[in-house]
Amino acid sequence: MLYQLLGVDLVAVEGLNEVTAQTILSEIGTDMSRWQDEKLFCSWLGLAPHNDISGGKVLRSRTLKTHNRAGQAFRLAAQAVSKTNTAYGAFFRRMRAMHGPMKAIVATAHKIARTVYFMLRDHTPFHDTSAEEYQQREREREIARLKKKATKLGFTLAPASA
């Protein structure tokens, strides 16, 4: 039924079920032109960091407190994907290892919210990637970053022979 209404299947997104998708839609509606871009959308949901800056120094960087039910639904979806073998699950576990569980939930919810925003705005279907593909991409990025840093310092990297 949601697919007929929206033209996209929100339930295909990992972590979103029928009830969560209905909660999100009842709060945000189907018209995504209310927000200029995904950053303003995530800020409205209370999932984007709010930087308090004074004199060029970031004093606090926390999400604003909000009682937005759609934001809460995205947080529930983020908790639901924590143990799945998907790209969102791998992202959650990586964030949890670096920043702890609370920040990982908000970061994953922010990522899911951006996906839903683009699905509803552009009417594009959800393309799921597995955790292995996600980890492979992250490994390639890390290797590229290390090579760039090594060349900047005057070194060359060579893969170890196994």
Describe each PLM feature range.
Residues 1-162:
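A detector of single, family-specific signature residues
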